[in-house]
Amino acid sequence: MMMNSFFPAMALMVLVGCSTPSPVQKAQRVKVDPLRSLNMEALCKDQAAKRYNTGEQKIDVTAFEQFQGSYEMRGYTFRKEQFVCSFDADGHFLHLSMR
């Protein structure tokens, strides 16, 4: 009786070990319209200036990252306070996070 269940289980383990590894998935890179990214940067600077009670000229945006359904801009104030602006896939401002 034990032999009847042993062979199918053993065959299953052998077949599982023979499967090929799944291909590595990579994020798709879509070229962002320069005008859109400049508008997003201006909006990010405006929101950060309001949050930190300073002028836009004292805000630096240092990084722009694109994710599957959103964008993030990282930056800091002249006092070295870091923040992240988040945007949806269409470039609409979502929120500003202080870091």
From Swiss-Prot:
Covalent lipid adducts (S-diacylglycerol cysteine), residues: 18
Transmembrane segments: none
Gene Ontology cellular-component terms listed: plasma membrane
Localization: Cell membrane
Bilayer topology term: Lipid-anchor
This protein's UniProt keywords: Cell membrane, Lipoprotein, Membrane, Palmitate, Signal
Keyword Transmembrane helix: no
Annotated signal peptide: 1-17
Record's keyword annotation contains Transferase: no
Lipidation (N-palmitoyl cysteine): 18
Pfam families, A to Z: YsaB
InterPro entries for this protein: YsaB-like (IPR025728)
Tree of life domain: Bacteria
Protein name per Swiss-Prot or TrEMBL: Uncharacterized lipoprotein YsaB
